[in-house]
Design a protein with these regions (language model features):
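Alpha-helical hairpin
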Residues: 13-14, 46, 73, 110
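General structural feature for long, well-ordered alpha-helical segments within catalytic domains
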Residues: 21-25, 46-50, 77, 81
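A generic secondary-structure micro-motif detector
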Residues: 15, 39-41, 71
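Intrinsic disorder at enzyme termini
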Residues: 1-20
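Internal helix-loop-helix
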Residues: 26, 56-112
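Short secondary-structure junction/hinge motifs that connect adjacent elements
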Residues: 36-57
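N-terminal capping segment at the start of a domain
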Residues: 28-38
Length: 113
């Protein structure tokens, strides 16, 4: 992490619940995602195992309303999750971040039909 981001990070006031999410994401990034990062980056393969692990942790439901089984969080916390995952594996990070671009319009503009 660059000195600028380190300074910003020390000024953030995360709630206990947000810290729990960040700790879980950091553990996932360190233990599951980072070990295979070089392989995915070299091969160009889709990081299916990493995305499955992200899904298992519940991170793909972060912008889905609770009524539909989601676990909504702040955009700030989402960005911290994306950064942590991307630091571990750029391929996985961009794939995870792209999920929001597909999901966001569905949540925002979708109907019950």
């Amino acid at each position: 992490m660059t000195p600028l981001f380190e300074r910003i990070e020390t000024r953030r006031a995360w709630t206990d619940d947000e810290r729990l999410v960040l700790d879980s994401v950091r553990r996932l990034a360190d233990e599951v995602i980072a070990p295979g990062a070089d392989t995915y980056d070299r091969s160009g393969d889709f990081p299916a195992d990493n995305i499955a692990a992200i899904t298992d942790l519940g991170l793909n439901g972060l912008f889905v309303p609770e009524a539909y089984g989601g676990n909504p969080i702040s955009y700030r916390l989402y960005l911290a999750c994306v950064r942590t995952i991307s630091e571990a594996c750029a391929s996985t990070g961009i794939t995870y971040a792209t999920n929001f671009h597909g999901l966001g319009p569905l949540v925002e503009f979708g109907s019950e039909a």
